[in-house]
Every structure is written in structure tokens, then in C-alpha cells.
Amino acid sequence: MQRIAIIDIGSNSARLVISHIYKNGAYNMVYNQKEALRLSQKVDEKNMLTEVAFSSTIETMKSFAYMCKIYQADKTIAVATAAIRNAANGAELVARVAEETGIQLHIISGNTEAYISYLGVINTINVKDGIIFDLGGGSTELILFKNRKILESVSLPIGAVNTTSMFNTRNVMPANVFSDVSFFIISRLEKYPWLKQNGLPLIGVGGTARTVAKIIQREKKYPATKIHNYSYTAQTYCSFFNRLRNTNLEQRKKISGLSSERSDIILAGSSIISCLLEATGAKKLITSGCGLREGLFFDYYSKENHVPIIAKDILKMSRENVLNLYEPDQQHSRHITHLVLSMFDAWGELHGLRKNYRRLLETAALLHDIGITINFYSHARHSAYMILNAKLFGLTHKEQVITAAIAGWHNGVSKNYFKDRFYKELLSDANWKTINKLALLLALAESLDYTETSQIHVIEPGINKKNATLKLYAQGIPSIEMHQIQEHLSWFKKTFGVELKVQLATAAEE
């Protein structure tokens, strides 16, 4: 096992993330620490970081170094962004940090920061074309990508902290000040005509983007607590921002979802997003919980493990990671996945579902047993909970709930259990009918490998004028599997309106 520490010293805050990489290539985060620094506010008239900035940064880095020691980190990757990059004495601070903590900070350029943030987004959000904005305390990185490849990028010295200081918007933002802020930002954005991409979504990275999403979720009483891949319309944003502009600092401190440490810089940060919507013509915003730190991890991981730095299929990548974390023996799960996909493909006339549901079924099948890690008893419920909360990229929030319900329901967990616990507001009655169909297919597939020996190695699902058919090819007589599948025949008839005729192939047919 290898332990990787990633440190990001930004203009507003500093972060330490420690992850484990296991021998089988699986990885997960085991520690996360955030410290507010506000370096963009600790710069004098000569563009020098003050002694207060030095002391607070060094104390934070000492704390990070101590935690790296506690977790026995094998590798530490530490970067500094806009505040230190733009300061006249940034290199001096880097030297002091190295001398007093032993950690070598690397000041990365704006273009490098943009690229690394892009890696964090493109490997975790399933969007082909879009514009990423990484809005920090002292800068905003903008990246245009199409077909998942970068076409343009730029780093602008406009952030939530330095814009707050420049226009004194810590408490309120009167109309005339907002006009000045907007003119200042738009005049800089207009220098990059490639930003005008009507129809492409804006993908937000950074604390301001996450906070805005959290506030909107609370206002809408959104049933999930996930921020990553949460999307909303530009109209929703404008309504939110118009309300926010009419608040003072004390009022904002009472807003659900807005932390007190960000309440003084949210006006400036939100103004930047408002100007980006105007400059790009975007109609939709997507929130990314992954950015610079995740990009640094993917960059390191790809080089060490000789895998593409940009995953071709992010759902498959993340699904395999979850499987490798919790399923040491994968033969059974992979075998029933093969069986259930054969049924889905052959019985399309019966289930009538779009091909998109195939990947949800595949994910549920591969991960249906991971709950055994917690306890064999009620493991279907545990599997469903783990799938619901796992870092499965490439699925919408709704798709992840459906996948979790398929995995749990196939093994007898009641529909009402999920309705009561799993964000029932996200799913319609039609969704539950779909889940029932897919859970049934998964139950059939699992019954065909009940002994987990792959005795039934090939199946031929079919449909004739009267019934659905399922011919089984096996080594020997799979008596236990033949008994188990009988228990699902009434469920099949109730769901699809036809009987399922199961036939074991003869030796001559093998």
C-alpha cells in the first residue's frame, strides 16, 4: 500500500488530502484537512505577502507535515497557486516553508493550474463539451473543452477574496457597486471571444461554486446531500443571485448552506459567476466537487500505474475502483453481470427500456455483493447504501439512486424500504417500475450462479409467440440453480405478463 499526500495552498484556504493506493490499484481518501488562510487579503501595497501571511502559512504547513508523518505518507505533492504565485516574495515564502517544515511547495503557473483542474473535472463528470471555471480566492481559471479535449484556457487574477477587497463588498453590494464589479469582470472576459459558446454548460470548481450549489439545494429542499455533478439552470442561478445581492453580512450568516467563513466573500464570488453566465451564454451550470487536488492525484496515479491520464469511460473506471476496494473475489459478480446483460439484450421487446439503463444494471450487478464487507446478513441493504454513497462517476444523482435500488431490491429488500430512505423525491412511479424490471433480471442472474461456481456458463434468452425462454448450458446438472430460479417465475409473469420457460440444454446441444 502507498500513501499519497496532496497539499494545495490557495488564495483563500489550504487543503491537505491523504489517499491510500492499494496493491490491486484501488484507492480511497483517508484524511482531509482544511485551514482558512485568506492570503489574498494579506498582501501589502508593494504586492508583498505580509509577515502575518508567512506565519499563518508556515503554521498550517507544520500542521500538514505532522499529519503526513502520522499517516506515514510515502509521497507528498504540494502546490501553491495565485496568492503565492502573484506575490513579489512568493519564492521567499516557499523557501521558508521548506526550511521549517521540510515540505517543498511548487508554485504552479495559471495554465498548469487550469490543466490540472480540467483533469479533476474530466475524469469525474460525464460531459463531452463545456467550459470549466475554477473560481478561487485570487484567480479564476477558464477552460474550454470539446470532445473532452482542451481547446483554450486562461488564468485571470480575479477571485472571490481579491475582488471583495478591491470593491469592499464584504458587507453589502449596492447597485452602483455591482455595476462597477460587473464592468471590471466583463471587460476582462471580453478579451477572450472563445468564451462565447451558446449552449455549452458551465462547470464550476472551487468553494464558491460548491457553496452556491449547496444553498440552492437547501432552498429547493433537494433530497440528496451530494454536491458533485449537481446541475441547475442559469435562470435558477439568477434568481438566487438577485436574492443574495439584497442581503448584508449578518443576514448572509443565517443562510442555510453558507458557512460563516465564506459569508463575506460570497457576493464577489457570485458576481464572477453571474458575469461568466453573461459572457458565455450558458443555460446550465454543473457543480464539480473535484478539481485541482483530484487532478493532481489522477496525474500522479496515471504515471505510477501506467494508465491513461484521461479515463475513456469514467463510470467503468470508478466502478472498478469500488469493486477492487470491497470485493476481493470478483468471479461471481463478473459472471452474473455477463448473464444479466445477456438477458437485458435479448429481452428488449419485453422490458422496453432504453439502452442507457444497461449501464445502470451492469453497475448494480458488479457491485451487488459489496455489502458483505459490512455484514453478510442484510448485505443487500448494505450494498445499496454503499453504492448510493460510493464515488461512482458518470452517473447522475438519480441514476445512482436507481442503481442502488436495483442492487438492494433484487435480493428481497422491500420497495418501501428504499422509498422511505433513498431520496424518494428523486424517483417517479415509472422509475420504480423500471427498477422492478431490472431487479428481477438481476435476481434471475444471481439464481443461475447461486453456488458461485459458474456451473451454468452460457445462457440463451429468447422470446416466442407465447413465452419468454431461457436455455441453460451447464457442466453437469445444476440442481441448486434450477431450484432457485423457480422462485422467481411468478415475479417474472407478474412483471412481464408472460411465463418464463427454463430449459437445461442436453448433452447433445452442448
Please report, for each region that a protein language model flagged, where it lies by residue.
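Gly/Thr-rich phosphate-binding beta-strand-loop-beta motif of the actin/hexokinase/Hsp70
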Residues: 1-28, 121, 125-156, 207-211
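Conserved phosphate-binding loops in N-terminal lobes of ATP-dependent enzymes
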Residues: 2-99, 104, 185-186
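Short, solvent-exposed amphipathic alpha-helical segments in soluble enzyme
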Residues: 21-22, 218-221, 486-490
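Helical "lid/coupling" subdomains associated with nucleotide-phosphate turnover
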Residues: 42-67, 81-87, 101-122, 127-129, ...
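Short secondary-structure junctions
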Residues: 450-455, 495-498
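Short beta-strand-to-loop capping motifs
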Residues: 472-474
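Short, non-transmembrane amphipathic alpha-helical segments
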Residues: 480-499
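A short amphipathic beta-strand at an alpha->beta junction
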Residues: 496-510
